[in-house]
Design a protein with these regions (language model features):
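Domain-start "cap" segments at the beginnings of catalytic or binding domains
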Residues: 23-24, 34-41
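Short, basic, helix/turn surface patches
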Residues: 29-33, 184
Length: 184
C-alpha cells in the first residue's frame, strides 16, 4: 500500500509567449507518491532545491483530452509528449508568509496515476517550508494486489464503501468473466 501526499500550500502555474502577449495561469495542486509506484522512467525524477526546477508527471489522458477534444474542436495544433517535455511552466508557491517561483518541467506521462505528480522529496521539502504548522495526511491510497480479478477484493471494498478510481474493480470483473467464458 502506498500513500498519496497532498500539497498543503497554494500552487499556481503559468505559461505563455511574451512575444505574442499571451499568458495563461491557473491555480492547481500537487500530489506525490513513493517512487516505487511511479509508472514512468525515474531518470529525471529528482528534486534539487538549488536548481529551482520541479519535475512533474501528468496523466497521459490530460494530453489526450487536449489533443482530441479541445485542440481538435478549435483547429489548434496537437501537442506531442516530446514537445510538452520542452515546455517550462512558471510555478508559484505560497504559504507560511513565503512566495517563491520555480520552473516546472513535465518529465513523463502516467497511464496509471490520475494526478499532477511531483517527487516525494520535493513534496516533503515544500510542505515543511510552505506549511510547517500542518501535517500532511494521506489523501488517497494505492493498493496493489496479486489478482485484481479476485471477487473478495471487490466485496471488501464495497463493504467498506471505499471508492476506486477508473473502475479498476469492474475491469477485474470483466477479465474474470472473459476468462470464465473462454474456459467453457
Amino acid at each position: 500500500v502506498g500513500a498519496f501526499t497532498p500539497s498543503l500550500f497554494k500552487v499556481s502555474a503559468g505559461l505563455g509567449m511574451q512575444e505574442a502577449g499571451i499568458r495563461l495561469s491557473t491555480e492547481m495542486f500537487f500530489e506525490s507518491v513513493p517512487d516505487e509506484y511511479v509508472d514512468v522512467s525515474l531518470e529525471k525524477w529528482h528534486f534539487d532545491e538549488d536548481a529551482r526546477v520541479i519535475p512533474i508527471i501528468i496523466p497521459r489522458n490530460y494530453l489526450n483530452l487536449y489533443n482530441f477534444g479541445f485542440a481538435q474542436s478549435r483547429s489548434l495544433p496537437k501537442l506531442s509528449e516530446g514537445l510538452m517535455s520542452l515546455v517550462q511552466m512558471d510555478i508559484m508557491m505560497r504559504g507560511n508568509g513565503r512566495m517563491e517561483q520555480y520552473k516546472g518541467n513535465i518529465v513523463g506521462f502516467s497511464n496509471r496515476l490520475n494526478t499532477i505528480l511531483v517527487p516525494q522529496s520535493f513534496m516533503d521539502w515544500a510542505n515543511k517550508n510552505f506549511a510547517p504548522e500542518k501535517e500532511a495526511e494521506p489523501s488517497r491510497l494505492i493498493v496493489e494486489v496479486k489478482n485484481p480479478t479476485d471477487t473478495a477484493i471487490t466485496d471488501y471494498f464495497q463493504q467498506k464503501n471505499y471508492e476506486t478510481e477508473g473502475n479498476n474493480l469492474d475491469a477485474g470483473k470483466t477479465t474474470y468473466f472473459l476468462r470464465l467464458i473462454t474456459a467453457i
